[in-house]
Amino acid sequence: MDTTELRIDTAGRHVLDLTDRAAAFAARAGGDGLLCVFVPHATAGLAVMETGSGSEEDLEEVMGRLLPRDDRWSHRHGSRGHGADHLLPVFASPSLTVPVQAGRLLLGTWQRICLVDLNDDNPQRRVRLSFLSGR
């Protein structure tokens, strides 16, 4: 298994496209297999989605309605509404798997791999990429 860890500075951005970095890693690994992407954080997740057409803003708006940043949450440590951050991985899984053929991600035309992080308390994130060869 080939693996690497990306260090991401979210710097107030809530949806970050990781596709190019994931594709470069898969190309270096080469061959056929599975790319596993994992976020080792309790307040961030991953999504496969279209980007650049307003979908990022739509996702933020929907998540804001589903998980408002107020004091309703039982989980209360951290900043106001931090309990909502701990529910995000229920909607945006901390892991996903993408098939790879001849070193290329087999994503659909408009599909991108995105880090989803609505938590402003921790701008430093890690993302683990692992390539499982089909050999």
Feature map (PLM): residue ranges:
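Active-site histidine-anchored catalytic micro-motif
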Residues: 1-135
